[in-house]
């Protein structure tokens, strides 16, 4: 096993930077405490890695929590086969740069049956390729705790979820059966077969995430920054038109414009926004006056009534 301890300032998450402001420092301390608590309480933790900005912050915090050692648990990417190509390139580069144990899982049933967002719709596609795929991967790895990057400010069902989110043996979540969390005391006692989803970023906001990225100089997928890109307008969203699998529907026209993404997922189900924000400073300034949630750009959040809570009850991220 090669020595994975960072030997450059660039790869050292603890390297000298300007001190964090008290608000961000408090959030960072809480997140690091949660990482260490879960690592100490559970036998087989794993970190869910979706390659987006929250995952990048989550990974940075995990590296800080256990520096100068390696991140002591694997990263799990549930791949649907429909991610932006820039996301996959960034994932592979990151795993190599930080010597991470990266597990990639694609639902074999979904792959064999050629389940796609175009042929089966967003609800069925997400259920099979994401929720079912995640349950398969967690069972295969016998993981009893999974770190996720969800934040309470994102969406209503996430707002009421605890930092330790307890799951049944079939990974289901019951929002009416959550344990109290007093201060920073977390009860990790589980029965055989049960598991926990742990959310170190629960109390962060989207602006907190971006300010922390700026303060800590955390690299991101370039899609978060505005650039002239091709797109088509479909179902009220601007869909990136770079993948040859995207076929134009009758009446659709391929356009070009300055766009970026506030959230990243599968490219056919993730809408861009018009933006001129090409730098971190410009992105933060744009977010400070935003009036809608970043999740407005996700088709899976509005494909049926109570969509996100229903998905989470069934085992979604």
Curated annotation (Swiss-Prot):
Pathway: Sulfur metabolism; hydrogen sulfide biosynthesis; sulfite from sulfate: step 1/3
Domain of life: Bacteria
Region (Disordered): 1-21, 298-317
SUPFAM superfamilies tied to this protein: Adenine nucleotide alpha hydrolases-like (SSF52402)
Pfam families: PAPS_reduct (PF01507)
Gene Ontology biological-process entries: hydrogen sulfide biosynthetic process; sulfate assimilation
Parts of the chain that traverse the membrane: none
Catalytic activity entry: sulfate + ATP + H(+) = adenosine 5'-phosphosulfate + diphosphate
GO molecular function: ATP binding; sulfate adenylyltransferase (ATP) activity
Keyword Nucleotide-binding: yes
EC number: 2.7.7.4
Record keywords, A-Z: ATP-binding, Nucleotide-binding, Nucleotidyltransferase, Transferase
EC category: transferase
Subunit text: Heterodimer composed of CysD, the smaller subunit, and CysN.
Cited function: With CysN forms the ATP sulfurylase (ATPS) that catalyzes the adenylation of sulfate producing adenosine 5'-phosphosulfate (APS) and diphosphate, the first enzymatic step in sulfur assimilation pathway. APS synthesis involves the formation of a high-energy phosphoric-sulfuric acid anhydride bond driven by GTP hydrolysis by CysN coupled to ATP hydrolysis by CysD.
Family: Belongs to the PAPS reductase family. CysD subfamily.
Protein name as it appears in the record: Sulfate adenylyltransferase subunit 2
Lineage: Bacteria, Pseudomonadati, Pseudomonadota, Alphaproteobacteria, Hyphomicrobiales
Gene: cysD
